[in-house]
Every structure is written in C-alpha cells, then in structure tokens.
C-alpha cells in the first residue's frame, strides 16, 4: 500500500449521519468515487482498496469508536509499513463552520479525541489530515457532535466531502502541496 486514508467516526446505524461521522461519510464517498467497497473486516475496522495514479490506496473506517481510532489505524500503518506522511486522516472539526474544508500536513489534536488517539498510538503528529467543518456547538459539545446535520446543512457537508475527495485525487496525482492548495484555496458554501 502506498497510502492509507482513514475516516473517523463511530460504528452503528444510529451514528451514520451524525456530525462526528463526517470522516466515515467521506470514506463512503471515496469508495463510491473509486468504485470500491469498504466492507472487509481488518485492522479493527472496515477496509477497501483501490489503485489510482499508479498508487495503491487503503480506505479505512475504524470500528473502535472515535476515542480509540488509533488502535485500528496503527495496526494498518504497521502492517503495510506506511510512513506517517502517507496516512491521511479525515475527520470532523468544530472549529469551522459547516462545509469548510481544510488540509494540513501535521499538527496537534486540536481537542479531537480520535486524532488524540492516533497521535498517541503512532507516537507522532506528523501525518496529514483533512478537517471537515461541522459547525461551532451552541450547546453541550457531546450532544452536538452526536446530533445529525440539519436539513439545510446537508448540502454543504456533501459539497465539502466532494471537495475533500477531489483533493485526495489531486494528492495521488500531484502530491500533497497541490492538494493543500486546492482544498485550502477557498471556503465551500
């Protein structure tokens, strides 16, 4: 495997369309875009793979629940001997309005427990991530991130996921700097 793309979320139907599952929704979109299925049970998660631009890519949805995402991801990284800079993690971010997408090469967990778990298990912050804005909570944070998107927000989220997927294509074709220029170039509204 050349790349691992992991989307963060919580398993189970009741969480499918919740804000905290933006990463899972992105992986589902990527699977469809690259004509694969994320249905093989491996690495404490669901996986699928595809080839694009002469790169082999593993899609991963950890089934460990958010706060233990690192347990699943580190297994895949170690099995395929993928360097952290070839691990792309997609997740929700309450720091951005709904539909904003941002990419960076490395950084702290920003208060996100799933990312915190990955950093702890990998022993490094040096992995790229794509953050999908889910809005700033006006209420209890746990209740907010586990709530479903409002109808008026759904189009913004799916456009953000489309933009993230296009960024992944650009990354595989032309590298991370081009992908970051595309993703960070403007705000999706």
Curated annotation (Swiss-Prot):
GO cellular component: cytoplasm
GO BP, sorted A to Z: protein quality control for misfolded or incompletely synthesized proteins; rescue of stalled ribosome
SUPFAM superfamilies: Peptidyl-tRNA hydrolase-like
Family annotation (PROSITE patterns): PEPT_TRNA_HYDROL_1 (PS01195), PEPT_TRNA_HYDROL_2 (PS01196)
Binding, tRNA: 15, 65, 67, 113
Localization terms from the record: Cytoplasm
Recorded catalytic activity of this chain's protein: an N-acyl-L-alpha-aminoacyl-tRNA + H2O = an N-acyl-L-amino acid + a tRNA + H(+)
Site keyed Discriminates between blocked and unblocked aminoacyl-tRNA: positions: 10
Record carries keyword Ion transport: no
Residues at the active site: 20
Pfam families hit by this protein: Pept_tRNA_hydro
EC number(s) recorded for this UniProt protein: 3.1.1.29
Keywords: Cytoplasm, Hydrolase, RNA-binding, tRNA-binding
InterPro entries, per the entry: Pept_tRNA_hydro (IPR001328), Pept_tRNA_hydro_CS (IPR018171), Pept_tRNA_hydro_sf (IPR036416)
Broad enzyme group: hydrolase
Keyword Transcription: no
PANTHER family recorded: PEPTIDYL-TRNA HYDROLASE
Family designation: Belongs to the PTH family.
Quaternary structure and interacting proteins, as annotated: Monomer.
Name of this chain's protein: Peptidyl-tRNA hydrolase
Source organism per UniProt: Caldicellulosiruptor saccharolyticus (strain ATCC 43494 / DSM 8903 / Tp8T 6331)
């Amino acid at each position: 495997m050349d790349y691992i793309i992991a989307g963060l979320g919580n398993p189970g139907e009741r969480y499918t369309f919740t804000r905290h599952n933006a990463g899972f929704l992105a992986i589902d979109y990527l699977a469809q875009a690259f004509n694969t299925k994320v249905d093989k049970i491996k690495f404490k998660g669901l996986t699928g793979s595809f080839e694009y631009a002469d790169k082999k890519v593993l899609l991963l949805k950890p089934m460990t629940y958010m706060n233990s995402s690192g347990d699943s991801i580190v297994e895949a990284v170690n099995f395929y001997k993928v360097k952290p800079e070839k691990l792309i993690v997609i997740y929700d971010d309450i720091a951005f309005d709904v539909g904003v997408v941002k990419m960076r090469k490395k950084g702290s967990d920003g208060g996100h427990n799933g990312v915190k778990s990955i950093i702890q298990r990998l022993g490094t912050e040096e992995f790229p991530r794509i953050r999908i804005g889910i809005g700033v909570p006006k209420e209890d944070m746990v209740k907010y991130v586990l709530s479903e998107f409002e109808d008026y927000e759904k189009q913004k989220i799916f456009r953000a996921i489309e933009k993230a997927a296009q960024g992944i294509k650009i990354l595989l074709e032309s590298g991370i700097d081009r992908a970051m220029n595309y993703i960070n170039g403007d705000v999706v509204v």
